[in-house]
Design a protein with these regions (language model features):
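Mature extracytoplasmic/lumenal regions of exported proteins
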Residues: 100-181
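A broad, structure-centric signal for solvent-exposed, well-ordered loop/edge residues
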Residues: 8, 68, 123-126
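A sequence-level detector of short, solvent-exposed, charge-rich linear segments
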Residues: 16, 78, 135-138
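N-terminal secretory signal peptides
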Residues: 20-108, 115-118
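Bacterial N-terminal signal peptides
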Residues: 5-16
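N-terminal secretory signal peptides that target proteins for export/translocation
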Residues: 1-2
């Protein structure tokens, strides 16, 4: 009985803490989801994996030297479909513009076109999961699609009050809209 009461108190506290930020986060998420339409990629086989089959918003990278993980797919067995392994290179853009990037197998240049595969809004950050629209040339002459997770950190109050111009301005410094579907 004691454990049940503790569980109820814990769940109630968690819900109470999230009520204030839940509405604003969903507002930010809704506005950004409307602005950054999600794309879908196809991974039927190893030779054609990463082809964009449903194009959403196309973004243009505004900076040079951004890391990207090489697209990886897996298959449980020979009869199951292939699926995308969510192995993104993470680039974190802090509140003051400080950048932290993980090393990765690909480097993307200014002007690289990207599509959005997913968008998440947390209490203190916006995460945009991207995929290169065209394959990127590797040093050995092969080409592969790249995957990068952009994490834009914000003061929780900025997202709680749904300050869309501030959020959009920070994202636009890195990712501009090339075309929207």
């Amino acid at each position: 009985m004691y454990r049940l009461m503790l569980l109820l108190v814990g769940v109630s506290a968690a819900l109470a803490a999230s009520v204030g930020t839940g509405y604003a986060s969903s507002t930010v998420r809704d506005v950004l989801s409307e602005r950054f339409k999600v794309s879908r990629i196809d991974v039927p086989n190893q030779f054609d994996e990463g082809h964009v089959i449903k194009k959403g918003t196309v973004l243009r990278l505004q900076v040079d030297g951004v890391p990207a993980g090489m697209l990886r797919t897996t298959q449980i067995n020979t009869k199951s479909p292939r699926f995308h392994v969510h192995d993104y290179a993470r680039v974190t853009v802090g509140e003051k513009g400080l950048i932290r990037a993980e090393p990765a197998s690909l480097t993307l240049g200014n002007g690289t076109r990207l599509v959005v595969l997913d968008l998440k809004v947390d209490r203190d950050r916006v995460r945009i999961f991207t995929h290169t629209l065209e394959p990127v040339r590797l040093p050995d002459g092969r080409s592969a699609h790249g995957c990068t997770e952009f994490v834009f950190a914000f003061d929780p109050a900025t997202l709680a009050r749904a300050d869309i111009p501030t959020v959009s301005a920070r994202i636009d410094q890195w990712l501009s809209i090339a075309s929207a579907s």
